[in-house]
Amino acid sequence: MKIQFIVCGWWYDEWDGKKNQTEFIDALYELKEENDNLDVMWTCHKTPPKIITEKFDYKEYENIGLEWGAYDKVLNDMDLDDNTFLFFIQDDMVVHDWSFINVCIDHFNLNPTTKVIGNGWNYPWDINPLEEARLSYWLKNGYNWRDYAKEENKHLYEEPLQCWSMRGSFFASKMKYIREVGGFDYVNFPLIEMPDGSDSRDPNGNTSEYLNGYKFTKVFGQQGMKYLSDQYRFSKYMTECGAGS
């Protein structure tokens, strides 16, 4: 059994203005060192510090697509077996109990209809992929949801659907399931400045999040998507800080 963590690197050991916040990094390194079947790859949107480069495999990419782009790009550069268990996680996650690893693996093994597991419940949304997407409300560019998808995945975005969704902060799956949906779709251009002076992190991220939620629901069905808790951004295993990357 092979376990692969894919960590979206942005905050590293500095969080909320405080440096040397290494609890997440230290725990992940300990897991890697103590388990021969567990590997960790950091997919970074800015140059990682030595605490990452000296302990983990990593790749650095331009910050396009936020966490969804980071996950997709690094998977394209890796050669993973179909049966590899995948754990996608942002480095601002507060982990209370690492036993979620075995909980997810046991659930996949006992419930073959389950294809992806998120942390806390996330909001469903009725989406018509041929209508204007969330990001386009801000940009006024008129793009529909399907316009943001990869060319090879556009055929999946055809009809109105109530989609369930997974936040990019954390979700687990298997490599064969991610290949089944053609990897991850995401807004494929950099963050821009919005009229109020902020950047487009939220509309970019929300559009990418629900693009993938639509696709997961379309291919796997709602029965294929599970959560570790029924609370938004929280389970007994993890709390999502929601800061983005």
What residue spans do the PLM features occupy?
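Hydrophobic targeting segments
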Residues: 2-7, 38-42
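Short, well-formed alpha-helical segments that are part of the catalytic scaffolds
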Residues: 12-32
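Acidic ATP/Mg2+-coordinating residue in the GHKL
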Residues: 43-46, 91
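Active-site-proximal specificity loops/subdomain of glycosyltransferases
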Residues: 45-82
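Short beta-strand-to-loop acidic/aromatic patch adjacent to the donor-nucleotide binding site
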Residues: 83-96
